[in-house]
Design a protein with these regions (language model features):
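Nucleic-acid endo/exonuclease domains
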Residues: 1-157
C-alpha cells in the first residue's frame, strides 16, 4: 500500500520517467544479461566450467541465442525472466517470447543437448540467487555423473 501511495503522489512526468528508466533497464539486461545470468556465469566459471555466454548463431534459426552453454557437458542453460510468462511488454510480445522459447527448446533438444530452464519467478535477492545456484549445481553434478537419456534432457528449476 505504501508503494501505491507514493506512486499516486508522483506527477505524470515523474511516472513517465520512472517507467522509461525501468524499460531501459530491462532492455539493457536482455542485451547484456540479467543479474541472475551474470551471477550464474561467474559462479560456474569460478568452478572451472567453460561457459559460453549469450552464444548466437549456432542454432538453426540464427535469430535465437542461448543464455549459457557448457559445451563439455552438452548443456544449455536458459534464464527466463518475467517477460517469458507475464505480459510485461504486452500480450503480443508475451506470445512471441513463448513461441521463441518453444522453438529454442525444440532446436536444443534436437541436437541431443540438455536444456535447463531457470524460471525466475521471484524478485532477485542474494538468497534467491544462491538457492537457484545450488539447485543448478545439483543438476549439473547429475549430468556430469551420467548424461541424461533422451526423454530426460529438459529440466526446469
Amino acid at each position: 500500500k505504501l508503494g501505491r501511495e507514493s506512486w499516486d503522489k508522483k506527477t505524470d512526468a515523474q511516472k513517465k520517467d520512472i517507467i522509461a528508466k525501468g524499460s531501459d533497464a530491462i532492455r539493457r539486461a536482455s542485451r547484456e544479461g540479467s543479474k541472475l545470468e551474470k551471477f550464474i556465469l561467474s559462479e560456474l566459471t569460478k568452478r572451472k566450467y567453460k561457459v559460453q555466454f549469450h552464444r548466437e548463431q549456432w542454432l538453426k534459426n540464427q535469430n535465437l541465442e542461448t543464455d549459457l552453454f557448457i559445451e563439455d557437458l552438452r548443456t544449455v542453460i536458459e534464464v527466463d525472466g518475467p517477460s517469458h510468462f507475464e505480459p510485461v511488454w504486452g500480450e503480443e510480445n508475451l506470445i512471441k517470447n513463448q513461441r521463441s522459447d518453444l522453438e529454442k527448446t525444440g532446436l536444443v533438444l534436437e541436437q541431443g543437448l540438455v536444456l535447463i530452464r531457470i524460471k525466475q519467478t521471484k524478485r532477485i535477492s542474494n538468497r534467491y540467487m544462491r538457492t537457484v545456484l545450488n539447485e543448478l549445481l545439483e543438476v549439473i553434478d547429475r549430468i556430469e555423473k551420467k548424461f541424461p537419456e533422451e526423454n530426460k534432457r529438459y529440466i526446469e528449476i
